[in-house]
């Protein structure tokens, strides 16, 4: 009962830290900018993290029970291999599914924003496009972050979460100081990229986790696709037909790659 209580407490504290992070960021933006900036940030975050986050909720429903069901200590070689396999399979599927979705969101935001809100919210377009890249990094690190929880290591989980929260606050504030609202989106993407690297290093040291070669290749391909998409959206106006032609081609490349790889994985 006590380990379960500690785990529940870790979840609650993690939620409080994330809520505190959001409050601090919004208070800073309200002080440095105005309520309009805060409103645009809230709207952009809702599109990226709430709507795209629903995909994570669906995919992770059966992952945590499977990971928790693997017995054995951190040092048990067979258990480490089994956990690595479980995490890597989930990570690979996350990246393959989220890659095309994020690419489509970034490309389609000029249409999505007026539909969900109105044309007055187009000021958050570039910020939201940059922040959306963070979803690919989240697809990578989220399955790995479950390792402390699956082992009942609530203290390590909280240390990990504390680092991530502090990093996000620093990157968002620095981004706003450098490039206004658009910089906040870039700061979010940078924070998630650093978090991914930190989680990989931490999990390698503590749990013996190793990212699979296949997962690494999937990550690199989908990241290059998103960088190509960002180059497109910042170089060509969405009012130009070339934007949509090239955008559809890039999105189809990502979708085709993911579809072929998923078919191989599920066989």
PLM region spans:
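Helix-loop junctions and terminal segments of transmembrane helices
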Residues: 44, 48-95, 145-150
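Residues that define the loop-to-transmembrane-helix transition and helix capping
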Residues: 36-39, 88, 122-125, 154-155, ...
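Alpha-helical transmembrane segments of multi-pass membrane transport and lipid-handling proteins
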Residues: 55, 59, 84-138, 169-177, ...
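N-terminal membrane topogenesis motif
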Residues: 1-14, 84, 88-92, 257-267
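Juxtamembrane helix-entry segments on the extracytoplasmic side of multipass membrane proteins
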Residues: 2-6, 39-42, 119-129, 242
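Short runs within selected transmembrane alpha-helices of multi-pass transporters and secretion channels
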Residues: 14, 18-22, 45-48, 60, ...
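Transmembrane helical elements of multi-pass membrane transporters/channels
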Residues: 1-69, 134, 138-142
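Membrane-proximal transmembrane or re-entrant/amphipathic helices at the cytosolic face
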Residues: 230-267
């Amino acid at each position: 009962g006590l380990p379960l209580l500690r785990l529940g407490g870790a979840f609650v504290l993690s939620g409080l830290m994330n809520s505190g992070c959001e409050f601090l960021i919004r208070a800073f933006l309200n002080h440095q900018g105005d309520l309009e900036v805060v409103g645009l940030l809230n709207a952009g975050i809702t599109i990226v993290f709430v709507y795209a986050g629903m995909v994570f909720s669906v995919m992770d429903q059966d992952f945590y029970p499977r990971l928790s069901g693997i017995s054995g200590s951190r040092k048990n070689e067979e258990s480490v291999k089994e956990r690595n396999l479980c995490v890597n399979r989930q990570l690979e599927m996350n990246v393959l599914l989220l890659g095309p979705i994020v690419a489509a969101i970034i490309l389609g935001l000029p249409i999505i924003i007026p539909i969900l809100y109105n044309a007055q919210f187009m000021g958050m377009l570039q910020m939201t496009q940059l922040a959306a890249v963070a979803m690919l990094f989240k697809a990578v690190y989220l399955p790995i972050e479950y390792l402390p929880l699956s082992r009942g290591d609530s203290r390590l989980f909280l240390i990990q979460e504390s680092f991530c929260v502090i990093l996000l606050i620093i990157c968002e504030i620095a981004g706003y100081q450098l490039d206004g609202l658009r910089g906040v989106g870039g700061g979010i993407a940078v924070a998630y990229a650093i978090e991914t690297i930190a989680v990989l290093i931490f999990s390698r040291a503590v749990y013996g986790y190793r990212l699979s070669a296949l997962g690494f290749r999937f990550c690199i391909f989908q990241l290059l696709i998103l960088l190509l998409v960002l180059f497109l959206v910042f170089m060509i106006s969405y009012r130009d037909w070339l934007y949509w032609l090239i955008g559809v081609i890039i999105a189809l490349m990502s979708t085709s790659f993911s579809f072929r790889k998923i078919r191989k994985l599920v066989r």
